[in-house]
Amino acid sequence: MIYIFTMVFSLNVLILSSSAARYDYFQFTQQYQQAFCNSNPTPCKDPPDKLFTVHGLWPSTKVGRDPEYCKTKRYRKIQRLEPQLEIIWPNVSDRKANRGFWRKQWYKHGSCASPALPNQKHYFETVIRMFLAEKQNVSRILSMATIEPEGKNRTLLEIQNAIRAGTNNMIPKLKCQKVNGMTELVEVTLCHDSNLTQFINCPRPLPQASPYFCPIDDIQY
């Protein structure tokens, strides 16, 4: 009887440990609404703002595939947080579909964020705190360096230095996309350690062959 109990207990531990995700760091990714809509194959249903807003907070690995769709409890509506999420984390392509966007982000990424973010409430509250209270808002960081969304051509170094000035001199990850002959800054990722306690240099820079690789100059923002 003791032998059977031990086997069952060991099996349960094995199942639980196998469902836990392994990750090395977090990517806090924000997208510039106008550039996103310009590059999106499907037209955005709402006029975009000249702002960076949250795309997601993603547990990530330095080598191999990032964890996705981990075992989790059923998603629940987060009505108390929705007024803030609607501002900082909208579904840019269709704001009437915000809830579906948040749900997808939770199931795909947030479900794998334990132990740093052990549940859905903690996950969304942390994003709000990072963006608002901790001022990890890319629009604000660029503005502090007098880089405003004026549709001007910027150099890669100019953008990188501005962001590094607001993130303890850590290197961000940038995504650009060429639309109608112009290269636009589409996304900025700020990277954090696995406990979300400090900025780190973003691992895994985009290869030069990537369609999102940013050139050294003539980046419109």
UniProtKB/Swiss-Prot annotation:
One of its GO terms (biological process) is RNA catabolic process. It catalyses: a ribonucleotidyl-ribonucleotide-RNA + H2O = a 3'-end 3'-phospho-ribonucleotide-RNA + a 5'-end dephospho-ribonucleoside-RNA + H(+). The keyword Disulfide bond applies. RNA binds at residues 31, 55, 91-92, 101, 104-105, 108-109. N-linked core structure at Asn-91, Asn-137, and Asn-153 contains xylose and at Asn-195 contains xylose and fucose. The active site is at residues 55, 105, 109. GO terms for molecular function: ribonuclease T2 activity; RNA binding. This is Ribonuclease S-2. PROSITE patterns: RNASE_T2_1. Self-incompatibility (SI) is the inherited ability of a flowering plant to prevent self-fertilization by discriminating between self and non-self pollen during pollination. In many species, self-incompatibility is controlled by the single, multiallelic locus S. Glycans are attached at residues 91, 137, 153, 195.
